[in-house]
Amino acid sequence: MDVNPTLLFLKVPAQNAISTTFPYTGDPPYSHGTGTGYTMDTVNRTHQYSERGKWTINTETGAPQLNPIDGPLPEDNEPTGYAQTDCVLEAMAFLEKSHPGIFENSCLETMEVIQQTRVDKLTQGRQTFDWTLNRNQPAATALANTIEVFRLNGLTTSESGRLIDFLKDVMESMDKEEMEIVTHFQRKRRVRDNMTKKMVTQRTIGKKKQKLNKRGYLIRALTLNTMTKDAERGKLKRRAIATPGMQIRGFVYFVETLARSICEKLEQSGLPVGGNEKKAKLANVVRKMMTNSQDTELSFTITGDNTKWNENQNPRMFLAMITYITRNQPEWFRNVLSVAPIMFSNKMARLGKGYMFESKNMKLRTQIPAEMLSGIDLRYFNDSTRKKIEKIRPLLIEGAASLSPGMMMGMFNMLSTVLGVSILNLGQKEYTKTAYWWDGLQSSDDFALIVNAPNHEGIQAGVDRFYRTCKLLGINMSKKKSYINRTGTFEFTSFFYRYGFVANFSMELPSFGVSGINESADMSIGVTVIKNNMINNDLGPATAQMALQLFIKDYRYTYRCHRGDTQIQTRRSFEIKKLWDQTRSKAGLLVSDGGPNLYNIRNLHIPEVCLKWELMDKDYQGRLCNPLNPFVSHKEIESVNNAVVMPSHGPAKTMEYDAVATTHSWVPKRNRSILNTSQRGILEDEQMYQKCCNLFEKFFPSSSYRRPVGISSMVEAMVSRARIDARIDFESGRIKKEDFAEIMKICSTIEDLRRQK
């Protein structure tokens, strides 16, 4: 029977069919090659938006810098970055007037956080620009290298383990006349491979010391590396994102802590909450506007879009905001928080890998690194690239472009939200002093604006006033891309509202399926995703049951573990059939061992091992979960593990799932190729840091009570904690006298070893 697809939607309101229009099936687009062009676009655009600002030269680095603050007032609708300081400060003052004590309280909370945050906070995060090697590294390695180089230069305050002390070292490093760094260099040599007896090129990385003068060091400390943002759906062009180095990261973290604390207290802020909590917050604002717009008033909502939010924001404006927010606070606190915006107003954007050239007959390929772009003959480039390079040349210093205005993606999401909310706050009747008033929602650069007025003229006047207020603060609402509707239908951060939020199920599509971690985790994640979508995203029972069957099928094909009584032949079927035949209780076999699927939509919350435990043969239980079985994963498995799932918008989010250690929770080994290179040392460092941090976490689980604060080293802290815990356990009868004595002996041994060292 042919189905006319339009019939499917006859009974469905258009908004509920929104899912079908989203570009979320199939693989997302990835970028290939270098991000140099995209970065140049960003730098050039940012300068263009602020072109009528004042040019100055940075006395330390010699970089030309453009300052658009308090620039000309706009004469047309083109996007500009000319924020007016007095307007921003006034918006902050009104925000404080509407929320008495908000800044004061947030400052106190932040001071407490600053006292307690440890350096290992900076090991969280993916790629980080490592200024010692001039390339990206995992966060833990980049931090380790930075601390190692600081120590080499006599900066050792950070050894206390507190983040604030590490930041003191950073400040001090910027005053030094020269910094000695340890950097890597590559040597290639031909050697004979033992296994294959062929000649291979072996690359070794040596470490060498190098001196940087003050200018060279400052340039590196202020550099943000750039990459192309991958996997962005629904866009034709790629765009560049930035990774800051370790010097900037800690300062940004504290500013964002303060801003987060403020956002939590603002009802119009879509950050830092997410999911259902966010929906509830939004629904409240809408409800308020609809109840107040009785029969006498009209209420309209704008689904807003801002033009190039990041490129028109300005770090100098953020400095003004912070100066105001912290105005009655201690000097040290104000200083710590003002460093991040100051560093950002002097930032340099690294242009990435440069350009790849190929000769016509494809015989020759050559890479033109970014450092060469300032001097190379431009006749080799096509027109558009030539224009980009010509424009950016005056800004180039050692392969990085001076970029004073603009914020780069994702650096101050919370603080820029505070700025946006301060405009929404000005819409109250007592401030507009006319018949119209507004309110709305702000989440980073995304906003929804609800305007109420007695008639259409009033609505128009309200929107115009909002638009102009935004302009004064360096925010450019796009008239082309924003649209207005009667209140009750709008979109905000990909949530679609129609008298309540409509589930946008397509968003979750990418996270369905087999994750590819291991058999145990994949089963657990798969059913958890289905469970979560039944709770949060209107996934109905019938569809969920179907999703479950599809998932099990997908899982069996991925791991070649079809049921023991199936006819399908795979590499594993021989072993699986053998197991099937010798198992008495076949229902007890895990799906990954060829067993039947016992999941249905009622028991998705139970880990498979627990679900089938009572049904298993005794010897199968013994093999599956025996800690002495060498195939049972010994990676300390927490009772709850975190998986990274890819929702369609926003960063990859972590999702908790239950983990039971069995023979199926294996951890794949690292690729051999890295172990044969000189990177091996880096890898070992990284694993060591990982182990130390994990060990420390074990001693001080964040849930128990506050992390140790003070000057003791990590080892001392762990030893003293071990002693306290042992005594408590001994006195409460949880451990025997011999165990207690042994723990005390081990602690003393550790202390002796430390003294000898």
Curated annotation (Swiss-Prot):
**Does the UniProt entry include the keyword Nucleotidyltransferase?**
yes
Q: Which UniProt keywords apply?
A: Eukaryotic host gene expression shutoff by virus, Eukaryotic host transcription shutoff by virus, Host cytoplasm, Host gene expression shutoff by virus, Host nucleus, Host-virus interaction, Inhibition of host RNA polymerase II by virus, Nucleotide-binding, Nucleotidyltransferase, Phosphoprotein, RNA-directed RNA polymerase, Transferase, Viral RNA replication, Viral transcription
Q: Which reaction does it catalyse?
A: RNA(n) + a ribonucleoside 5'-triphosphate = RNA(n+1) + diphosphate
Could you cite one Gene Ontology molecular function of this protein? RNA binding
**Is Nucleotide-binding tagged as a keyword?**
yes
The RdRp catalytic domain covers which part of the protein?
A: 286-483
| Localization in the cell | Host nucleus; Host cytoplasm
Q: How is it modified after translation?
A: Phosphorylated by host PRKCA.
InterPro entries to which the protein is assigned, alphabetical? RNA-dir_pol_NSvirus, RNA_pol_PB1_influenza
| Spans annotated as Promoter-binding site | 249-256
Write the Enzyme Commission number(s) for this entry: 2.7.7.48
| Cross-referenced PROSITE patterns | RDRP_SSRNA_NEG_SEG
Q: Name one GO cellular component term.
A: host cell nucleus
The UniProt annotation puts motif Nuclear localization signal at 187-195, 203-216
| UniProt GO BP | DNA-templated transcription; symbiont-mediated suppression of host gene expression; symbiont-mediated suppression of host mRNA transcription via inhibition of RNA polymerase II activity; viral RNA genome replication; viral transcription
What this chain does, per the entry, is described as: RNA-dependent RNA polymerase which is responsible for replication and transcription of virus RNA segments. The transcription of viral mRNAs occurs by a unique mechanism called cap-snatching. 5' methylated caps of cellular mRNAs are cleaved after 10-13 nucleotides by PA. In turn, these short capped RNAs are used as primers by PB1 for transcription of viral mRNAs. During virus replication, PB1 initiates RNA synthesis and copy vRNA into complementary RNA (cRNA) which in turn serves as a template for the production of more vRNAs.
Membership in a protein family: Belongs to the influenza viruses polymerase PB1 family.
- What quaternary arrangement does the UniProt entry report? Influenza RNA polymerase is composed of three subunits: PB1, PB2 and PA. Interacts (via N-terminus) with PA (via C-terminus). Interacts (via C-terminus) with PB2 (via N-terminus); this interaction is essential for transcription initiation. Interacts (via C-terminus) with human PKP2 (via N-terminus); the interaction competitively inhibits the interaction between the RNA polymerase subunits PB1 and PB2.
The name on file for this protein is RNA-directed RNA polymerase catalytic subunit
- In its UniProt entry, the species of origin is given as Influenza A virus (strain A/Swine/Ontario/2/1981 H1N1)
